[in-house]
Amino acid sequence: MSDLVAGDTQPKRKIDWLALGLFALGGLAAVSLIGTGLSTAIYGGFGFLQQVSSSQGVLSGLNYILAGGLLLVAAFLALLQLMGRSAPRLLAPRSGRKRAPHLLVLALPLIWVAGHTVSQTDAAWLLLPSLHMLAVGFPLLWLIWLAKREFPHIKPLRRWGALGSGLALSPFLAVILEFVAGILFFLAGMLYLSFSPEMLFNLERLFTRLSWGNPSMETLTRILEPFASDAVLAVLFVGFFAVAVPFIEELVKPAAVLLLLRRPITVREGFVLGAISGAGFGLLENLTQGASTEGWAPLVVARLGTTAVHMITAGLTGAALVEARDRQQYGRLIAAYLTAVLLHGLWNAMAVLPVLAELSDAYPRHLVITPWMVLALLGAGSVILIAAINRRLRPVGVAGEPESG
């Protein structure tokens, strides 16, 4: 009887709700992405059999499958956590110094040249997806290494959970909020147009031309020129991408760190997990928005800077979140968030200004070239900042500390 009573009073293991959420939502997102990727890739494959241009469809499909596969790893680790099992050795961190993965970066020029060459051929649908994954994955691995080098180890579940958050949770929240913001900016633009009969006529002409079918780029540029030349519409256009979008995305990107604030977590972990979450956010953009054979190489190179910016901004906010929790002071958190918004906003502004300059002669010609120089400086500066903050937060004389739970 005493044994029975003792057995009944044994404490039950508490449910790890974060792991449960990662397993359920991450698994659902993974299945959705893989399903979308398979259907897109198969459709592209049929296009090839029918001698129709299919490279972009196959590339997009395989990219979705890759993103879904990464989420499956995160969901699998969450399942192991729920079952009380350890992560496989392949995914578990190892102690000791690791060789810097600089060869990954040194291989990039060869990958870019090969990808550019392949993208001009009929074999692009078959060969470009693999080169695209290497061109996106190699710098991502190097940047993550740069953010966490010589730091105490972090459990695989946390690292992969942060990546999964950046791949699924943060983009999902961002899309909802940006949709609402987009409606508000659109309504503001329509309200402004309602006071200008001439602009309303131009808008009607645009809709009429679009209803006829896909216009040529020259025709579309000519129709959009009055809108691009209008100062108020230009401010709304740039304001959405350079103000509203950064405020929203920098709010949701460190979601992984925010969810861990009720658990033991250090400022170093906040920076690394924030950076990894930003890497996931940038990876999803690279895999979806860079899935084109037209201008493949320049687009892939440009999006490397985007990933670095996403990582440094989310890393800054992630570290500041943990510090604010520890000190119960929020001045640095606000400063870090506004700095992240400023960096992201400047990047987006430099990316959209050339669009206006291409559409209208009302803007100086240097707006076509100068922003790209600023983008290059921002991308390089973000990489330097990642390394500098890592060095500043790096513990002295640490060979390997226990993993955080």
Predicted regions and their residues:
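Hydrophobic alpha-helical segments at protein termini of multi-pass membrane proteins
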Residues: 1-405
